[in-house]
């Protein structure tokens, strides 16, 4: 042969194994199931899955389907379509979905399952009530480990919901590790058919369950709260089912019926069904199938084969026995010819010994031998290879003792456990049909005895005399303990000569090794469960070579010497396993073979032996070679336990996997909080039916048992240790649980390979290697990403698929225990542990196990259920009914959920009186946020409250007291009535005199004019709403969704069509409605507010678009402000809010909002409209983020907590009200300026509550005492400057809204000029007033963010000092409509000039104004509040005051709780501020928060007329000295350091009226709605004289008198 050809053949021979293995690996990866890769294991490719319907579809006949196995893919649920009966089992497993994914799934046709229902790890499924609403029967013909229903690790399952299930004919119910599953104990399982308590295994399900059934449920038995268990009230006879209405079904019905007493309308049949009718037995000519239906012979034979490949067969009944349709013939029956002698489909009864014929089988263990039990004839070869076991001979005799004939050959190979063949006690005939493949050495053989190390005897002598081998001889080799004479004796009984057989005289009867040639073996490729070996050929005469035997075994320690014969005794389990391969043809071809079914990451020893004919003089064998398989996915960690030892921690421990399949380096712990379903607890009255904590019950039981043990002898005895029986019982329970879990995993997670066919085993062809076996291999899809973990514990968060909760992951190394920190108290957590290996270069991935899952709840926090005592309050009805309403706030973060409240109360100071305790359910509390005690006796009462949560903690508040007033005596009532009448008379007389005086005083002014103007805020109650041009057709309004609740009703987002010029135009609008239950006055008020808004046409005031007054309900169509009110807008932009991507507003944005609010308020002020409720909640934000003044009182009910009911008056926004409004009820535009300052404080703090820490009553006292809020931390200069001036105590010292706009103009956007009221002809703007706006930033820009400055310097802008004679707010002095200065809107000239120092000072003396801010870093891009939001802590400060000369004694303490130390005593309001000069900063930190900088202005005298403040001031009443603030006013007037703006003649305002204005002021104070216009004064520029208008009309005065009489 040419050398080149030899080299080429050698290359080909070397490449073939590698190519074959590559193809093999590709085939394995192709077969990996992607659906199961997320579970880290590949599902089973098992023949029975064809029966279960995996991966295929069914075409049910008459609604009958075979077994169904649904996993991983929602498409597989199509297998259940049109199925009425599943003849088999239903298995659903391995889904990770959401609840929404199952809500569209429903199979109402399914009524019966003949085997079992199994569900495993179907995440997202909450109930079966919609999935199988009509499932009525589970027969349990075949069980899953003795159970008919199995629910295992169903994480989201809350209830079974099998509302129509009536019968479980056989088997138990196992519900395990379903940590949300409730309503188990409310089911009468005995009624369904599971009467044995041992058959009900309910383990590790939810402990605290509502388990409350509605009242209609009999005996409180139900599947869910609203679904009662059916059939409990059945009054029919025994074993008869009922309909829902109690009507009896027919006796033949099982599980219920549709129509009473009708066998055609049964859900299922007790016996059999034929033609959709229930019958007691099958009619003649039909065959009973599966004990439930009758088939004709054609229908029976047309059935598909069963999973084992058996064809259907007919069995004709005899002597009244039913005819059957079967897959296998029963005992005493054999398969025979059918009546027409055309096919083998008939089971025929045996006359004597039934020749039960079975197919040939390979027996590798006792279980395989049991398959041939009762068989008398084996058609085909019988192969036995049992290497080990206990009582093997006895078990084989039971299974094989009836065999009389084996038609082909008997192979007994490598059965090391066999000593004799006596178990074949009835064997007589062998080899009636010997195949040609069983020919060796030109001869055929029927009996093979090979390599049976411990075989000593063959058959009993008496039996050998009866035995016959019809064809061929016997082949006996390598039976070391089988003596040659025994073999010869057996041949003599068979009448066979040695020439007809192959018997080795060398290898039988001894274990002496033969002369051998060495073979070389190498490992070509390795997988996790397979290896490919290659070895050189047998060098001797190939004609003498029979086969190659691969011997291999697992070794624990490679360091020990490995001997071929070591351990090969009768009782050892450490034996060599073998694989047999036929010789490869070809002169130079190397031999290859594959070992499969290996364990991952395991070391094996292997050697190869060449078997030759008996006449061969040489044998061959390799040396022992070792190799280690690749690692694979570990099994799940075992004994996973989570223990709660702290409210915020869980200690998790586990044990390593049973099958690590590699080197376990770390564990992943994935956990997340399970959301509490609060709705499920609303279905139960916990006052009537209290919750019993399962763990507490167990604890009590354990304690009682401990007491019994401890008290058995004496008190010094300790608890006895557990007995051996108790320990064995516990061990047995653990073993049962482990066995069931292994059994479950075996059927859910299975390897994907099949057994090699026997013929391939003997005729191996290396070219067919990839097609021989289909095996698992690691899939990169199931591996984790490559990570580096530098620390012992690494924590990161991620979102798992199909989960909305935040999922956390912890990785631990070198330990099987971890503590999970920072958990929420009394919260349930799902904990999953995965065992993982490091990245492996051989498998190119990091392998992890499937998840071990457990659930645990953290311990409760005792303080979490405590009610905040500051929220407890009482309201006593004033009608002497003895009714007291007690209100409180629920704990903000309770232990799970507050179920009820306990209210304890009794008469005070009566110790012997038994207190009363009232239980208040959660639903009752939520109705009124409190509870009303009725008909209490007058006197002093004490009470306390406790909240009871799921943790069942009970902690009462401290005792509180209230007094129920005693009703007045009849005599005293009469006296009071008389006194009241007298006082009323004199009051009316006094008022009449005052009115007359006023009228007379105004009458004598002959040159006066009478001007009556309508005040938009006060409309006479007699006036009804009249439709006008604002009326809109109701059909043009379409409501889309709810936006929130208004004061009168719901507010909707809607669309208005054709309300503008274009009839087809649709615009988004906000639609306000009135509740259906609203009174007439409420509807009138609702439309009155709309009437008020008709007068407003300003860009920065929310526009009214129309009104629908006809019909009900009335609608007010407003401009849609898409971003809601400013309060919620600011809160939504806090850094601590959970709004990804939303940043706090920048400083320029806040200043822009402030300018827009000021512009809207300036417009209202010019319209003579006093808002009285300016707050962030009443400012609305458009989609373009433009802020507009809101809806004037319509939002009051939404923020009810922001209002306070003072005395018997209406709700007042006291936290936004000016001092004069709180004390005297005076509301002006300047009191709105005070509120504007509070709004700016809200904007700086992102909508924190003003005066935090103080109650409403304390706020009133706080402001009345002369204190203001502290500026927020990091307050910007501009905002601090404005707030300080807006909060001036005297109204005339506050800026006007137009002055505020001019101050803010340099920071406002250019677009402001185009849309603002300020820049209109009546808005007051003059040329130059807007210079330096945002469009052209100069060096004076100060765009610092809100936290860029300290609070101490917040109001100290870095200024450019330029001489100026203006005041604080630099503005134009002349504009259309009159002069415009710092003071506007009715500030009295004389009041301004009262006590003003008249000294002139030159510019050199330091008269400077704040013209602009100085240079600073531009950080306008920074967020408004970059740090986490910290609610400002309010401290008490005095109001701005510059005229007081008091001392410490003048500052009265209001008695409020101090949240922080009082202001520095050296900086009290009585101290005067130093005059500013060119070297002093008017906003230095020492003044911030206490009083504003002192600026001087030029004083312009007017006709030299200066009068004292006391002479011009008019007070309606003398202030209560207890309510007045610090002494801040001096009789000497304003100090020289006070503000002194330019004086100007202005109209008197309500809070500065003269004596002649007393009627108007009085009416306002009394709250009248009569529109009385004050005397108004106007300015004559040429003379600077005052002109008074005419007095009110006499009819107006008469109306006032009538109102007073009524009061």
Curated annotation (Swiss-Prot):
InterPro entries: FN3_dom (IPR003961), FN3_sf (IPR036116), Furin-like_Cys-rich_dom (IPR006211), Furin_repeat (IPR006212), Growth_fac_rcpt_cys_sf (IPR009030), Ig-like_fold (IPR013783), Kinase-like_dom_sf (IPR011009), Prot_kinase_dom (IPR000719)
Top EC class for this record: transferase
Annotated Gene Ontology cellular component terms: axon; insulin receptor complex
Residues the record marks as active site: 1173
Membrane-spanning residues: 976-996
Glycosylation sites: 82, 188, 245, 275, 332, 343, 495, 520, 663, 710, 778, 796, 802, 868, 879, 940, 953
Bias (Low complexity): 1524-1538
Keyword Nucleus recorded: no
Locations listed in the record: Membrane
PROSITE patterns for this protein: FN3 (PS50853), PROTEIN_KINASE_ATP (PS00107), PROTEIN_KINASE_DOM (PS50011), PROTEIN_KINASE_TYR (PS00109), RECEPTOR_TYR_KIN_II (PS00239)
Protein kinase domain mapped to chain residues: 1037-1308
Name used for this protein in its record: Putative molluscan insulin-related peptide(s) receptor
Origin organism lineage: Eukaryota, Metazoa, Spiralia, Lophotrochozoa, Mollusca
